[in-house]
């Protein structure tokens, strides 16, 4: 019985070694390289849209519209509006903290008091 088990074990090791040398490994095939779809998913639409090789196809816009050249050069792809909103929010918050620290907010009526009158 031990002799059969040893022979079986030895034959399995030999088969595994031979299959690796001939490239017949049972593992899954490796995925190589990036496709446009995977790069767009991982990097976002702005990274793919601004890639130079994709913008060279000026005749074919496909699903996405190409931004005008002035917007790309100036960097105005919808970010200034968001940046202005962020800056405004930060300034309002800092003003609130300054007024709270100065005690100016303690004298203001609460919203319930203004609704009652």
UniProtKB/Swiss-Prot annotation:
The keyword Cytoplasm does not apply. One of its GO terms (molecular function) is neuropeptide hormone activity. GO terms for biological process: nervous system development; parental behavior; positive regulation of cortisol secretion; positive regulation of timing of catagen; positive regulation of transcription by RNA polymerase II; protein kinase A signaling. Residues 1-19 form the signal peptide. One of its GO terms (cellular component) is extracellular space. Its main location: secreted. It is found in: Secreted. Residues 20-30 form a propeptide. The modification Threonine amide is found at residue 61. Pfam families: Galanin, GMAP. Keywords: Amidation, Cleavage on pair of basic residues, Hormone, Neuropeptide, Secreted, Signal. Endocrine hormone of the central and peripheral nervous systems that binds and activates the G protein-coupled receptors GALR1, GALR2, and GALR3. This small neuropeptide may regulate diverse physiologic functions including contraction of smooth muscle of the gastrointestinal and genitourinary tract, growth hormone and insulin release and adrenal secretion. Belongs to the galanin family. This is Galanin peptides. It comes from Coturnix japonica (Japanese quail). The gene is GAL.
